[in-house]
Amino acid sequence: MIAKLTGRLDSNGAGHAVIDVGGVGYLVEASARTLDALGAVGGEVTIHTEMLVGEDFLRLLGFARAEERDWFRLLTSVQGVGAKVALAILSALEVADLQRALASGDSAMIARANGVGPKLAQRITHELKDKAGALGGISGSGPALSAAAGPVGDAIAALTGLGFKPGEASAAVAAANEELGADASLDALVRVALKKAAK
């Protein structure tokens, strides 16, 4: 499981960058905002990552901040929102703007992203409206965000590492966290989340 990379920015292209870590180049897909934040080629960078594993693919997605990765996981928990659409939304909107749009039910703002039609934007807004405040994206330092970066985030990463889609992993861990409470350990979260995901 690769959660973070620190190395030299080897190249920066459309929709992806290559990070050289000890002579190994990691191809990392990312939103336009993250790619802009990486700076000039040749510079030292740190990028938070999410690994997607499938039968015939292995993809590494990169995020400038851990909170952007948390929002990616939340977005992909919505049916019809895959990695490509989630990255398009994060390219079109700052995390704070995304949170405000969801909290206010402004689906038109979500629909600004490439590949997001009105119906999908409405579904995203409807399903995530009540969850928008949980990540604390406007300040970037709310208690729920720090919790998501701890055992909850680690449990989601563990499930995606086992081959679950980010959306499935997020939903299963959220259900496990609700059942076990805020003080749940990583082991307990993963164990219960696996049972939830298997249903």
UniProtKB/Swiss-Prot annotation:
Pfam family, one: RuvA_N
Signal peptide: none
Gene3D superfamilies according to UniProt: 5' to 3' exonuclease, C-terminal subdomain, DNA helicase RuvA subunit, C-terminal domain, Nucleic acid-binding proteins
Domain of life: Bacteria
GO molecular function term, any single one: four-way junction helicase activity
Region described as Domain II: spans on this chain: 65-143
Keyword set, alphabetical order: Cytoplasm, DNA damage, DNA recombination, DNA repair, DNA-binding
GO biological process assignments: DNA recombination; DNA repair
Location(s), subcellular: Cytoplasm
GO cellular component: cytoplasm; Holliday junction helicase complex; Holliday junction resolvase complex
Region (Flexible linker): 144-146
InterPro entries: DNA_helicase_Holl-junc_RuvA_I, Hlx-hairpin-Hlx_DNA-bd_motif, NA-bd_OB-fold, RuvA, RuvA_2-like, RuvA_C, RuvA_C_sf
Region of interest (Domain III), ranges: 147-199
Region entry Domain I, spans: 1-64
Primary role: The RuvA-RuvB-RuvC complex processes Holliday junction (HJ) DNA during genetic recombination and DNA repair, while the RuvA-RuvB complex plays an important role in the rescue of blocked DNA replication forks via replication fork reversal (RFR). RuvA specifically binds to HJ cruciform DNA, conferring on it an open structure. The RuvB hexamer acts as an ATP-dependent pump, pulling dsDNA into and through the RuvAB complex. HJ branch migration allows RuvC to scan DNA until it finds its consensus sequence, where it cleaves and resolves the cruciform DNA.
Domain topic, free-text comment: Has three domains with a flexible linker between the domains II and III and assumes an 'L' shape. Domain III is highly mobile and contacts RuvB.
Family, similarity comment: Belongs to the RuvA family.
The protein's assembly and partners: Homotetramer. Forms an RuvA(8)-RuvB(12)-Holliday junction (HJ) complex. HJ DNA is sandwiched between 2 RuvA tetramers; dsDNA enters through RuvA and exits via RuvB. An RuvB hexamer assembles on each DNA strand where it exits the tetramer. Each RuvB hexamer is contacted by two RuvA subunits (via domain III) on 2 adjacent RuvB subunits; this complex drives branch migration. In the full resolvosome a probable DNA-RuvA(4)-RuvB(12)-RuvC(2) complex forms which resolves the HJ.
Official protein name in the record: Holliday junction branch migration complex subunit RuvA
Species name: Sphingopyxis alaskensis (strain DSM 13593 / LMG 18877 / RB2256)
